[in-house]
C-alpha cells in the first residue's frame, strides 16, 4: 500500500507556541522522524524570512530636498541617515497599496514614527522609532509612499521612470519576520530514543504573530509541494457494516504487541491474556501490579505509552469486547 509511505511516519503529538513578548515566539514540535527536524526547520525558516507579505515605505519626498545626498538646515541627521531610519519603520497595512502618509513637525525635538499621520488601514507599529532630530526653529515635512510586497526590494527597483524630482526611493524590507533560528534535539517516544525535537524562535515586527507566521509559511510549502504529487490516493474499500459508528475509540482494536514495549512488559501482558489495548485500559493499576513479574517500572512504561495515545488505565469501555473483534481490527487498522 503506497499510503504507508506517509501514513506510518510519526507525526508530532506536541506542537506548542509560547511568547515572551509580542514580537518573539518559540515553537516546540515533537516527536518527528529522524532527520525531519532539520528538513522542516530549514524549510520553514527560509520561507518565513523570504516569502511572507508585509508593508514598507517605498519612497519619501522631503520638502526642500532634491536628492538623498542633501542636508537640511536645523536637522541633525543628513538625508542619507534619515532614509536609513525610514527603512526601519514597522507598518501594518490591511489593504493593497500604494498609500500616502505625511509628517510635519517643528523643533526642537525628535521626529518619531508615531508623529506620522496615517490613513485608515495603515498602522505604525514602532511609534517611538526616531526618524530625525530637529533643532530650535527647524521645521520638516515628509510624505511617504507605502506599499505591500514580500522579501527585500532595493531602492533602484522602487524608482519609477516618471518619478518627480525630489522623490527619493527607499530600500523596502517587506518581510514581517525579522529573525528565525532553530535547533534539533533528540526526544523519546515510547521505547524509541532518537526521534527529533524541533525548537524554533521567530522574531517579527509585530504586524503578525509568530504562530500565524509559521502557519502561513507551512501553507506556502504545502501549496508548492502539492504540485509534485502526481497520483490520486487509492480509496480503501470498506464493507458497509464497517461504516457503522463504533461505541469506542478504534485505537482500542490495536494489539498490545504493536506498542513497542520492553520484553518484560510485553511478556507480562501476554501471560495475563491481554491482547488488545481495549483489554489493557480496563485494568486498574492495582490489578496490573498483581500480575506475576510485573513491577512499578513496567507500570510506568505502560502508563506513559497510553498517555501518548490519550488513554489511561482504569477506563470503562462500553460493548467490550465486541463480536468479530478480529474483523473489526482489520477494517479500522488505518484509523489508529
From Swiss-Prot:
> What InterPro entries does the entry give?
DNA-dir_RNA_pol_insert, DNA-dir_RNA_pol_RpoA/D/Rpb3, DNA-dir_RpoA, RBP11-like, RNAP_asu_C, RNApol_insert_sf
* Biological process, per Gene Ontology: DNA-templated transcription
| Region of interest (Alpha N-terminal domain (alpha-NTD)), residue spans | 1-232
Q: Name one GO cellular component term.
A: DNA-directed RNA polymerase complex
Q: Which GO terms describe its molecular function?
A: DNA binding; DNA-directed RNA polymerase activity; protein dimerization activity
Recorded hits in SMART domains, A to Z, give: RPOLD (SM00662)
Q: Which domain of life is it from?
A: Bacteria
Q: Where is this region: Alpha C-terminal domain (alpha-CTD)?
A: 248-336
Classification via Gene3D superfamilies: 5' to 3' exonuclease, C-terminal subdomain, DNA-directed RNA polymerase, insert domain, RNA polymerase, RBP11-like subunit
Asked whether the UniProt record includes Transcription among its keywords, one would answer: yes
Query: Known EC number(s)?
Result: 2.7.7.6
Domain observations? The N-terminal domain is essential for RNAP assembly and basal transcription, whereas the C-terminal domain is involved in interaction with transcriptional regulators and with upstream promoter elements.
Q: How does it assemble?
A: Homodimer. The RNAP catalytic core consists of 2 alpha, 1 beta, 1 beta' and 1 omega subunit. When a sigma factor is associated with the core the holoenzyme is formed, which can initiate transcription.
Which family does the entry's similarity section mention? Belongs to the RNA polymerase alpha chain family.
State what protein this is by name: DNA-directed RNA polymerase subunit alpha
Record gene name: rpoA
Amino acid at each position: 500500500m503506497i499510503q504507508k509511505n506517509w501514513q506510518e511516519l510519526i507525526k508530532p503529538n506536541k506542537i506548542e507556541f509560547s511568547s515572551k513578548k509580542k514580537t518573539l515566539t518559540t515553537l516546540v514540535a515533537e516527536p518527528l522522524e529522524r532527520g525531519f527536524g532539520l528538513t522542516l526547520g530549514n524549510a520553514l525558516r527560509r520561507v518565513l524570512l523570504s516569502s511572507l507579505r508585509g508593508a514598507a515605505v517605498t519612497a519619501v519626498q522631503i520638502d526642500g530636498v532634491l536628492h538623498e545626498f542633501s542636508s537640511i538646515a536645523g536637522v541633525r541627521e543628513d538625508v542619507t541617515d534619515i532614509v536609513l531610519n525610514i527603512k526601519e519603520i514597522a507598518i501594518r497595512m490591511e489593504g493593497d497599496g500604494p498609500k500616502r502618509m505625511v509628517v510635519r513637525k517643528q523643533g526642537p525635538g525628535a521626529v518619531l514614527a508615531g508623529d506620522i499621520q496615517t490613513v485608515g488601514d495603515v498602522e505604525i507599529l514602532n511609534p517611538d522609532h526616531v526618524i530625525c532630530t530637529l533643532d530650535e526653529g527647524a521645521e520638516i515635512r515628509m510624505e511617504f509612499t507605502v506599499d505591500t510586497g514580500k522579501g527585500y526590494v532595493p531602492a533602484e527597483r522602487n524608482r519609477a521612470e516618471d518619478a518627480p524630482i525630489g522623490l527619493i526611493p527607499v530600500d523596502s524590507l517587506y518581510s514581517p519576520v525579522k529573525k528565525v533560528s532553530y535547533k534539533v534535539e533528540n526526544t523519546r517516544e515510547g521505547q524509541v530514543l532518537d526521534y527529533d525535537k524541533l525548537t524554533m524562535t521567530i522574531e517579527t515586527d509585530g504586524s503578525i504573530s509568530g504562530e500565524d507566521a509559521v502557519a502561513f509559511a507551512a501553507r506556502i510549502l504545502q501549496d508548492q509541494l502539492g504540485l509534485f504529487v502526481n497520483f490520486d490516493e487509492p480509496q480503501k474499500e470498506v464493507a458497509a457494516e464497517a461504516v457503522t459508528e463504533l461505541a469506542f475509540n478504534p485505537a482500542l482494536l490495536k494489539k498490545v504487541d504493536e506498542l513497542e514495549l520492553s520484553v518484560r512488559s510485553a511478556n507480562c501482558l501476554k501471560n495475563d491474556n491481554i491482547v488488545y489495548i481495549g483489554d489493557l485500559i480496563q485494568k486498574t493499576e492495582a490489578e496490573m501490579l498483581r500480575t506475576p513479574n510485573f513491577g512499578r517500572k513496567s507500570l510506568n512504561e505502560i502508563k506513559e505509552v497510553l498517555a501518548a495515545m490519550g488513554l489511561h488505565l482504569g477506563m470503562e469501555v462500553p460493548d467490550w469486547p465486541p463480536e468479530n473483534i478480529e474483523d473489526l481490527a482489520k477494517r479500522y487498522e488505518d484509523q489508529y
